[in-house]
Amino acid sequence: MDAASVLDQYVQDLANLPSEVAHILEEVRDKDLKFYETRKRIQQRDNQIHKFIRANGSLAENPKEQAAYPKIRQDFQTAMELQDEKCTLAAQALTLVAKHVKKLNDDIDKLDAEGLLGGAPPQKPISANRSRATSSATPAPEPPSRNYTRDRANSRRGGSPAASRSSTPGTRPPKKRATDKNNEAASMSKESSVGASEQLRNMPETVAVGSLDAAIRAGPGEDDEVLYCFCQQPSFGEMVACDNDDCQYEWFHYDCVGLAEPPQGVWFCPSCSKGRKGDKKKR
């Protein structure tokens, strides 16, 4: 016994199942029609009795009433029998289908017990913090250094501010609290403990979906697992740096902060801008 032979046999066994079920349902339909005809006769006889009472009063004797009662009782009995037969046919159809399902489950259990179903594990849904099992031949571009970006922004303040936020990032941004290998590992561990699910739960639904779509389009980034942005994912696609030196996240994916192009001039992330509303008004 192997999986292929079990599948082939199961398909053959199911060949006649549609026609068998259709035949049972046709019988149910036929009994349905008989039931409605029987109920219609009962209603007609009952209407005749009530019509006579409305015309002659309830004390007047109806010569046809006594003859109608046995027929009404007989029709009720017929209707109940038809309903029971319909239930029996429905149970037959259920048993017929359940028999094939049980046979398939039994065969699957046998194959599993013999170790013949040891295929690849099921795919898991995309997770924000999971390690990427595949590496990209062309790694995703990374955000430029914060200082490099600010220097360019200051030097070109009189020209095009958008040039300070290049859509083709260069070197990897340094983490402020990770100056060496040990500190970097500790920082990553601390950020991971926060949990991507908690961060995404606090984000608007449209932002979270946009961030995930952007990650899928960009593909896997570098081998490091340094996390950025509200979504706490590695760098991918286009990213922008917050101009607040004390920003908790530093770098942000465009989709996560609702950007479609490089921002003009000084830019603060949503978290930092809340505390700098007064400064913005002065500027």
Curated annotation (Swiss-Prot):
Name this protein carries in UniProt: Chromatin modification-related protein YNG2
Entry annotated with the keyword Metal-binding: yes
Free-text comment on this protein's domains from its UniProt entry: The PHD-type zinc finger mediates the binding to H3K4me3.
Compartment(s) of residence: Nucleus
GO biological process terms on file: chromatin organization; DNA repair; meiotic cell cycle; regulation of DNA-templated transcription
Gene3D superfamilies hit by this protein: 6.10.140.1740, Zinc/RING finger domain, C3HC4 (zinc finger)
Low complexity bias spans: 127-139, 156-170
Chain residues that bind Zn(2+) 2: 242, 247, 269, 272
The encoding gene: YNG2
Keywords from the UniProt entry: Cell cycle, Chromatin regulator, DNA damage, DNA repair, Meiosis, Metal-binding, Nucleus, Zinc, Zinc-finger
PANTHER family according to UniProt: CHROMATIN MODIFICATION-RELATED PROTEIN YNG2, INHIBITOR OF GROWTH PROTEIN
Ranges for region Disordered: 115-201
